[in-house]
C-alpha cells in the first residue's frame, strides 16, 4: 500500500512545467510522474468525449501529474534546503525605514528586505502583517481525497485523467506515477459542519447517483471543507508579497492552484532579480489580471460540472462534445491558461 503521508496528487499544466524545467525538473525519475494523454469527460457513468492534452504540449513541456511529495522534494533539493529554517511562526512585523523586522514566536528576530508569504488559504501571517483578521469564505462544498491502486475493477483509462460529473458533485482521477497509483478527489456540495461523516456523504451524494463508483472509495479517505478567497489583497507594506493560496485560492475546478503558485513565484523572482522599481504594484497588477482570467473559468467549470437538471445536463454534454474539437475555443478557453 502507498502511505498517504507521501502526499496526494497534483496536476501541473505546461505553464508551470516550462518554469520548473529551468531548474532541472525534466531530469527527475520518470517513474515518479505521469504525462496523461487525454482528459476524459463522463456524465455519471457514460463517457461523453475527451480533450487531447497534447494540444498544449511540446517535446519537453508536457501536462504532468504527480504526488505533492515528489514536487516538494525536488524543490527542496533545488532551492538550497540548508538556507531554510522550518517551524518558525511570525508574531509581529514592523517597518524600520526601508526594511522589515520580523518577530517570531520563539523570541528571535530577523531584519529583512522582503517578506514573501505563502502559508495557505488560512494565512495567519497575512492577518498579522495587515493588522486585521482576514478569513476565506466557505465554498459550500467538501473535498474527499484518496490514493488508489490500479486493479481489474478500475473502470477508467489508466493513462488519462477522468472527470466524472454528477449532480452537485464531480470526481477527478489521474495517475500520479508509473507504479499504478492514482489520485482521487471528489468535490461534493455539502453544508458546513463540525462533524462530517465521509461514508454517509459518499453514500447519499455519490453512490445514490451511481452505484458503480463504489470501488473508487475503498481505500483510506480524508475530507476537507473547501474554502476560497474573498479577494486578493495588496499589502500595506511595499516589500511584502503574497503567493499561492495566501494570495488567492480558487474554486477547485481548473487544476491551476499549484501551477499559479509556481507561475507567480517566477514572476516575482524576475521582478526582484531585475531590481524593478515599484515591484509590488507591478506584481499585484499582473497577478490580479491573471487571477480574474482563471477565476472566471474555474467558477464556470464548477457550475457546469455540478449541473443537476436533466435537460441542462444533456445540453452541457452536447456542447462539450463540440467544444473539445473546436480549436479556436480550446485555444481561447484553455490555451491562454496552459501555455
How should these model regions be labeled?
Residues 1-8:
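Glycine-rich FAD pyrophosphate-binding loop
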Residues 13-129, 134-147, 189-199:
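Conserved N-terminal helical subregion
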Residues 35, 87, 96, 167, ...:
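Structural motif
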Residues 49-72, 152-223:
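Conserved FAD/dinucleotide-binding core of flavoprotein oxidoreductases
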Residues 111, 181, 238-239:
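Conserved catalytic motifs of the protein kinase core domain
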Residues 116-117, 220-305:
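Conserved mid-domain beta->alpha element of the FAD-binding
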Residues 122-123, 143-145, 169-172, 247-248:
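Histidine-centered metal-chelating micro-motifs
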Residues 317-339:
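C-terminal auxiliary extensions adjacent to catalytic cores
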Amino acid at each position: 500500500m502507498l502511505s498517504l503521508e507521501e502526499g496526494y496528487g497534483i496536476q501541473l499544466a505546461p505553464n508551470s512545467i516550462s518554469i520548473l524545467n529551468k531548474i532541472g525538473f525534466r531530469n527527475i525519475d520518470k517513474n515518479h510522474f505521469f504525462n496523461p494523454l487525454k482528459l476524459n469527460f463522463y456524465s455519471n457513468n457514460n463517457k461523453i468525449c475527451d480533450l487531447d492534452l497534447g494540444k498544449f504540449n511540446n517535446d519537453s513541456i508536457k501536462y504532468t501529474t504527480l504526488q505533492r511529495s515528489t514536487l516538494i522534494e525536488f524543490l527542496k533539493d533545488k532551492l538550497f534546503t540548508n538556507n531554510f529554517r522550518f517551524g518558525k511562526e511570525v508574531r509581529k512585523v514592523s517597518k524600520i525605514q526601508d526594511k522589515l523586522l520580523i518577530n517570531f514566536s520563539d523570541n528571535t528576530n530577523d531584519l529583512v528586505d522582503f517578506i514573501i508569504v505563502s502559508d495557505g488559504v488560512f494565512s495567519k501571517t497575512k492577518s498579522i502583517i495587515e493588522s486585521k483578521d482576514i478569513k476565506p469564505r466557505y465554498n459550500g462544498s467538501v473535498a474527499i481525497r484518496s490514493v488508489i491502486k490500479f486493479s481489474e475493477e478500475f473502470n477508467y483509462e489508466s493513462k488519462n485523467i477522468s472527470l466524472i460529473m454528477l449532480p452537485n458533485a464531480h470526481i477527478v482521477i489521474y495517475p500520479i506515477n508509473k507504479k499504478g497509483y492514482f489520485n482521487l478527489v471528489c468535490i461534493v456540495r455539502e453544508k458546513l459542519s463540525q462533524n462530517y461523516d465521509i461514508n454517509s456523504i459518499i453514500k447519499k451524494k455519490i453512490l445514490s447517483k451511481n452505484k458503480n463508483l463504489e470501488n473508487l472509495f475503498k481505500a483510506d479517505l480524508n475530507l476537507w471543507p473547501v474554502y476560497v478567497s474573498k479577494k486578493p489583497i495588496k499589502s500595506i507594506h511595499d516589500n511584502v508579497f503574497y503567493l499561492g493560496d495566501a494570495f488567492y485560492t480558487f474554486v477547485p475546478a481548473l487544476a491551476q492552484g499549484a501551477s499559479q503558485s509556481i507561475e507567480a513565484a517566477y514572476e516575482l523572482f524576475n521582478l526582484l532579480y531585475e531590481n524593478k522599481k515599484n515591484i509590488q504594484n507591478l506584481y499585484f497588477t499582473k497577478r490580479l489580471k491573471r487571477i480574474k482570467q482563471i477565476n472566471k473559468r474555474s467558477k464556470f467549470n464548477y457550475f457546469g460540472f455540478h449541473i443537476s437538471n436533466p435537460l441542462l445536463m444533456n445540453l452541457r454534454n452536447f456542447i462539450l462534445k463540440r467544444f473539445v474539437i473546436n480549436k479556436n475555443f480550446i485555444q481561447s478557453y484553455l490555451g491562454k491558461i496552459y501555455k
